[in-house]
Amino acid sequence: VKSKMLAAFTAVTLVALLVAGCATPAAEPEPTTPPPAAEATATPEPEPEPEMGTTYKIGFGPDVTGGGANLGEPQRNWAEIMKERLEESGGIVGPDGVVHEVEIIVGDSESNPDVAASLARRYVDEDEVVALIMGSVTPISLAIAEVATEAEVPYISMASSLAIIADPDTGEMRPWVFKVAQSNGDVAQWQVERLTDLGVNSVCYMYENTGYGKDCYNNSSAALTDAGMENMFEGAFERTDTEFPQVPAIEAAGCDAVVIGAIPPGAANAHLAIRTALPDIPIIHGHGVCTTDFITAGGDAVESAEMPCSAVIIAEDIAADNPAKATWMDFKDAYEDYTGEPVSTFGGHAYDALYWVIEALETLPEGLSLAEQRAAVRDYIENNITDWPGTAGIFKLAPDDHYGLDYTSFTWFKVEGQKFVPFPEEEW
């Protein structure tokens, strides 16, 4: 048994050895190659905080209350929009890379010259503003112009009279005073052209008893007289009047057309009284009525009223190649989004004035004294606001012209279907 087990074991062993001899030898394991070492990444340097410089302050004081409120409220609205824009942008950057916050200090001139002058002095002396943007109407602006001139602070008025920027005796520009609203002299040129086209030989003139109304009358009556039209009647009224004893005199005068120089509500109330008495007589206005307040106050009575206005109120209909199109759309869209109301040409005056100052501030290096800042802003506006597309037109300021517009900044309109509708000369 033992010999059989040994023979079996031997046989199994021989077979195992034969199998092992025929097998392929196992491959030697290759050494493991370590992964390449990661390249050292430099820790990024944090971007340096921008250098912050002087905070610039602008004194902004439209007539939010009182007789000029229809003009001042839209102007205040734009100032609030501008404050939001400046906050979102983090301020402005000077030519040296220094960042400056811009603070717009909004007040109310209250349509009162004394209040306006006091507010201007506070802005200048206590708030240390670099510029003033104030005055929605002429008498307020004239009061502020005196303060600005004495303090040597650049001042931009949002009212229309040329007397604001030019000495009435010499005609010379007031060095520190500018304005953005179209002038009544340019309005008068449009009125002459329209009334001439209508074949008018005589006019009756109604105007509000304010600096604005008197400036309207002075410019229009002179231009109409020069054009050979007889002034049959002139009469003044208060801006808040609702009764107009002048109307019977207009009826008796027998004039061919009536011209009104006023803003709402007086302009609408006077129009209503005249239209009621003389349903067929042509009635034309100045640019003080280029606001929906005029249509709201006058209703159906102001249908067919005509006036010159800035085309910003129909910005979306203006050709794309118009150099002011982008400005008009920027203003119109932002204003209507913010207020939920139709765009106002008066708010546009605030747009133009604020961007003049902002553009000037962007050129100031850090380190200037307040007096140097004020002088530099004045110089920039006088010399660099040229071919500048604003809401009121293309401005071309110069040392001898602190206004920079002409009558071509207007488009002739009429009220139709309770809207302002363009009424170009080819349709007259």
PLM region spans:
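Extracytoplasmic "Venus flytrap"
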Residues: 52, 59-82, 107-113, 136-137, ...
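Extracellular/periplasmic Venus flytrap/periplasmic-binding protein
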Residues: 115-118, 163-164, 174-278, 349
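Signal peptide-proximal N-terminal region
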Residues: 51, 56, 78-104, 226-229
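Beta-alpha junction/loop-to-helix N-cap segments that form part of ligand/metal-binding clefts
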Residues: 70-77, 92-168, 180, 236-243, ...
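Segments of small-molecule ligand-sensing domains
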Residues: 334-347, 358-422
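Extracellular/periplasmic periplasmic-binding protein-like sensory domains
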Residues: 274-351, 363, 420-428
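Ser/Thr-rich, Proline-interspersed low-complexity disordered segments
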Residues: 17, 21-49
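Periplasmic-binding protein-like
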Residues: 123-136, 154-158, 204-207, 254-264, ...
